[in-house]
Structure formats: structure tokens, C-alpha cells
Amino acid sequence: KIWLEILPSQIGKPFFFSYNVPRSIGERGLYGSQMGSSKLVEFQKVGNQVQLIAKNTQFFAKEGTPQAQFVSESFSDSLMSSTAMVSQPHPETKSILIEANSLLFTDIPGYQTRLEASFRMPFALDTRNTSFTSTKNTSALTGLEVKAHFAVSKLSAPPMTSSIVPATPPPSATPDPRSMFVSFYYSLMPLPEPMQTRLADERVGFFTVARTDFTTDAKIKSKTHYLERWRLEKKDPSAAISEPKEPIVYWLDKNIPEQYRATVTAGVLEWNKAFEKAGFKNALVVKQQQVTDDFNNMDARHASIRWFTGADVGFAIGPRRSDPRTGEILDADIGMSDGFTRSARRILVDDLARPRGPDGEMCEEAETSAQELHYALDLLEARGLELDGPEADALAKAYLKRTIMHEVGHTIGLRHNFRASTLNDLKKIHDAEFTKVNGMSSSIMDYLPFNIAPKGEKQGEYVMSTIGAYDYWAVEFGYKQFPLGQEEIGLNQILAKSSQRELQYDTDEDAGYGSVIGIDPNVNRFDMGSDPLAYYKLRMKLSRELWDRLQNMNLATGESYERLTRSFRSGFAQVANAAPLAAKYIGGVYTRRERAGSSRPLFEPVDAAKQRDALALITK
């Protein structure tokens, strides 16, 4: 058993509480090396019980006012867990002991619901076979890793008769589908002094924390959105460019294959270009965790990059956790599937799990990105690329760097920008000297396809190798420091540039989700060039080239047709992806994020000739 000592000064004191998932079962969205959620919590003593309470930080009013009283009466906190005291107060310190086992051997993460959603089976936490695997306690952090056992007593018998509704299969990646272990790393640490907040603006894409202030009814809008961002302060506030007092440190986990560590490091440090323009030199630092290091990268004190894998996985994700009072980012952990760097033949295009996340909270490149990689390598292999040769290795590392840059962007607070890919025309994106400096797109935060030129034409970079103009601008808006009393003026000067083409922004809600597509044909995932319709035509042309080459491919005697079938399907997937995006032109509307006083309209219908061109493409 493990006991926690709680001092009287720690009762009613706010703490940052989070959980991460170091180990899971490796299928259907349940993977290891994933971040969980976080809360602002307090320990509260009720009789002999000590409760772990998640405080409601969404709604507040100034302490001591009548408004603060009615807010506390109107909205509830939440009980995360509770346990009985196991000691009398210490005679000198007055501290008490509680049993960590009974406090944390509960389903605080709500993983039973996730298991039920994935398998439609009533898995329950088995506390008798749940245990602690590691603990860490310092003045800055208390960390405990729980190896939780989830089980179900029996599997459902198959139906006696066939059904038009297919049954959800049980787990297939565990030796026995009735039993599985999942690890949770719980972190509890003191909150920092509140950081100075910065108000969000809809013209720049940052993740935000929202708080509703009921102190006064004079405001039309009581809800305020603060940027999620790291605390960066200059060592020399008077210098135009200064190193920060505390840089943002990314720890490379010791589970990253050695041949990819330099590429991952390069992807992280690429963002220092933007931070230097915003006034910070060496804002981002990369450190390698050694085998002898005794800390866990899954704790809340270390921003990290980790590898993971699974039976059906091929995605990367870059979430972050912030102080709900101010938006200060306190932790971030990038999870990188080895499917991004392994051979394209390893990627399971047919049945990839789809990470879920409302309003762009999670990076959802999984299925389409894997299809895109498979398609690109199919076509390049058909043109003569050797998948086990140096050119393919360089391509895989370039793709890895691009992915790391994208995910690091999320961990510094940036949302997707799905308008960014329309900045340059199709000719410009094959000018390698230009794109190495400026990027193919105005932002790495777009979902960008492989840049493949038509047969016989000039080939530029296959993937984006640096950050774009929008990325520099967004970092400047989020992180630039100003002299006392000058912040509002300085931020407005930055925002005044938002109408410039290379700085325009639209995100997940604008591009649409699932079967619901947006109204602006220039805001899409996986398009490229200033004329998306021309790009869709190019992709269809490339698919026809792939099919023609596959027609003449000779398989070795005894070789399976599966490889050929999958390659044909990757070409058809391009057509399937292009058709609904081309349909956005028909009845489509170009949108703009403008403020009152602008001469540019907020909405502009797509030209009729362009609509007819799109219709002709779809109906061919």
C-alpha cells in the first residue's frame, strides 16, 4: 500500500491534476503514450473522508461579491474520488495520511466508457488485480503510475441467426479478449502564480480556455477566451531578441528509434525561426532522455515526444494541457506512430482507428494521411523508386520532420489552418529553392498532401520542409512581449495584417467534419495550390498514370494480387476524396474573417463559370 501525507495548508489549496496513458491495448483508438485530461483540483475534508474535488473554473466572479455567491450556488464542482483518513493528525505538523490505493484504484479517467464505446462490452475495473508500478515525489510533483486491470466475465455468444447489423468484434490485440491492462500516470503538482493572459482573436488560430465572468453585467459578452500558450519571459526585457528565462523543453523519449532522433529534433527546432522573429532566441530546446534518467516523460513536468504503435494505427497527435485560469500551457506530449516511418506496406489503410476530438482539439490526420502516404509511394514506386533505397529513406525522414513540425505547432497552442495551402500556384510549389525558404503553404498547420508533379514535369520538394508566413505571424501574435501599457496597441498592429493573403486563416469548423463539408471551396484538408479545382484535376491525372503503370506491372509467379489491388484502391481513394471537395464549388461561397470597416465582403459567391467547371469534373 501507498499512503499520501496531506498537510493542513494543502486542504482547500488548488493543484494541477492530470492523467496520461503510458500503456494501453493497441487497437481501436486505445493506444499507449497518449495524453489524458487535466483538472484544477482541491483536497477537501468532510468528516473522516478526504475528497478529491475538481473545481469548476468555467464560471466565476470576484471573491467577496454577491455575484460570487450566486455563481457558487448555480454551478457545481465534481467529485473525482474520495477515501477515508487512515491516521490521526500528526502531533506536530497536524498532517493526515490517506491511502493512495483506494483514492486512485477507481476509474477516474472514465476508461470503462471508452472500452464500451470501442467493443460494446461491459468491461469493469478489477481493483483486486490493480497495482502501482512506480511512484515519484518531489516538492514540484507527485507522480503515481497505476496498472489498472479491466475485465469482463464472459464474451457474448454469437447470434443464432444472421443480422443486417454487424456485431462489434471483441478485442483482438490481447491474448484473452476478456482481460486487459491499461496504465495511468497521475500527476499532482502545485499551480504556478497566474500568468498574464492574452485575449484570443478569431483571425488567428489558437486553442483557448474560456471563462465566464459574472462580476459585472455591464459587458455584452461575459465569456472571455484566453490563448493557450507557454510562459515565455525574456532574460533581458530591454533587448529586441533575448533568450527566455525558461525555454520550452521537449524531451525525446528513450523509446524513439535512434535513426529518427536527429529528424525529430530538426522538426522541433524549426519553430525557433518564428520565435526569434517574435523576440525570443532559442525558445525551444530539445533534450534526449537517457536510459539512466529516473523521470517518466508521461508526468506533467516534462513535455515529450514518444513513439507508440498498435495493431491498427497510423497517426500522430500533439495535445497540450493548460492552466484553466490563464491558458498557460503546463504540459504537452506528442505521440508518434511508427507507421509514419515504417514502410508504406505496413500502414493499414483499410481499418485505421480514427482519433476523436471536438472542434479540432485533436489532430485527426489518421486515415487520410495514411492513404496519402500509401498513394504517393505507390506512384513513386511505379515510376521506379526503390522503397528500400536511400531516396525512399530520405522521403520518409522528410515526411517525419513535416509531421513533427505540425504536431509541435499544436503543442505551442496553434490550431489547424486549412486555407493555408492555397497561397501558391501549382508551378510555384515545385520551385524547391523558393519552398525551402518560404514553404509550399503559408502554414505547416494545414493537412498537406505529397507534392507530386505530373510525369515529365519539374519536381520540387515532396513535402513541406519549413514553417510558413502564417506560422511566423501567429507565433508573433501569441508570444511577442510589449513594453508596459503597449500590448493592446502592439497586438492590434499585428492583427491589422490579417487580410494579407498569406496570413488568412480558417480551421476545422470551416472545412467541415465527416459528411458535413464547409461552404468555402478554398478551405479543405489535403489540397494544394491557389486553385484547388486544378489540383483535383491533377490528382485524377496522377491516378490514371498509376493505373496505367499498374496495368503493365508483372507480378512474380505465386505472388499475391493483394498488393496490386491495394495500389488500385489507393488511386480510387484520390478520386473519392476529390469529388466532394470539388462539389463545394457548386453553390459555394468564399468567406473572409473581416471586421467592420473593411472594404472586402464577408461572403462572395463562387463565379458561375467555376461552378460549371467543377460540375463537369464531377460528372466525367
At which residue positions do the language-model features occur?
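Short, charged/polar "capping" segments at the starts of alpha-helices
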Residues: 258-260
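Solvent-exposed, polar/charged alpha-helical surfaces in well-ordered, non-transmembrane soluble domains
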Residues: 262-269, 273, 398, 402, ...
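Sec-exported extracytoplasmic/periplasmic mature domains
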Residues: 269-280, 310, 410, 414, ...
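The catalytic-center signature of Zn2+-dependent metalloproteases
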Residues: 288-308, 398-454
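Extended catalytic-interface subdomain
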Residues: 328-347, 358-365, 404, 409, ...
